[in-house]
A protein has these predicted regions:
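Short glycine-rich, Thr/Ser-proximal phosphate-binding strand/loop in the N-terminal lobe
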Residues: 20-48, 181-194
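N-terminal basic/disordered segments at the start of proteins
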Residues: 1-32
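Generic alpha-helical propensity signal that fires on short helical segments
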Residues: 9, 36, 41-43, 85-92, ...
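Small-residue (GG/TT-enriched) beta-loop-alpha framework at ligand/catalytic clefts
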Residues: 12, 17, 22, 112-209
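Active-site neighborhood for divalent-cation/phosphate handling
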Residues: 28, 35-43, 51-153
Length: 210
């Protein structure tokens, strides 16, 4: 049984989700009641997210299982660059022009071939180091990536163009596709429903949707 459990831990990929104020861990487990084990972590205010993660390794049941593979979903501002205009050596300068306040972060990117863009996003260097020190196989991914892929497939159903809204962490991500490309993508702070509604209607009108 111990050997079997060890093999499952080696094969499984843990998921870490991190935003400005939240941190959680999850893993697919076919023997669990809902086939997924989800563990939110209570973030200590006034302490860096890297320090919170270090402490979580001492407290979290999932982190203490010894997983070697992890995917980290990062909720940070995303810059989309068309594939044909992407040059890796320009990433830092390009991102700093678009978003201020990330000079001390590592700038990462993930190619989105189905959408012909590259998603560029930052991660705190200390947080990145804590992750890489504790896992052998690490994949950093923008939090919107699975949502983009799922809704891009959905966008081909029906004859009308669609505007998608994703609410999370007191924010609103709005995006629209035109075949295999983004027609629109932007993020808004929207702690209240009336703010979200305003942004949705504004973008709807801006895009000329019916």
């Amino acid at each position: 049984i111990m050997q079997l459990t060890g093999n499952k831990t080696l094969q499984a990929r843990l998921t870490i989700r991190v935003s400005k104020n939240t941190l959680s861990f999850s893993v697919v487990d076919r023997e669990a009641e809902h086939q997924v084990i989800y563990e939110p972590y209570t973030v200590k205010s006034g302490v860096s997210m890297a320090a919170n993660l270090r402490q979580a390794f001492k407290e979290s049941d999932l982190l203490q299982r010894g997983y070697q593979k992890v995917r980290v979903y990062i909720d940070s501002p995303i810059l989309l660059v068309p594939i044909e205009e992407f040059h890796e050596e320009d990433l830092g300068v390009l991102y700093q022009h678009a978003f201020a306040g990330h000079h001390s972060d590592a700038i990462l990117y993930r190619v989105q071939p189905a959408l012909n863009v590259v998603a560029v996003f930052p991660i705190n260097k200390d947080f990145k180091m804590v992750v890489e020190d504790n896992f052998q196989d690490v994949r950093f991914t923008p939090i919107m990536q699975p949502m983009w892929h799922y809704l891009h497939q959905r966008s081909f159903t029906g004859i009308h163009r669609k505007l998608y809204a994703y609410f999370h962490d007191k924010k609103l991500d709005l995006f629209c596709f035109d075949k295999n490309r983004f027609k629109f993508f932007n993020s808004f702070n929207a702690a209240h429903a009336k703010d979200a509604l305003y942004f949705i209607l504004y973008v709807w009108k801006q895009l000329g949707l019916d």
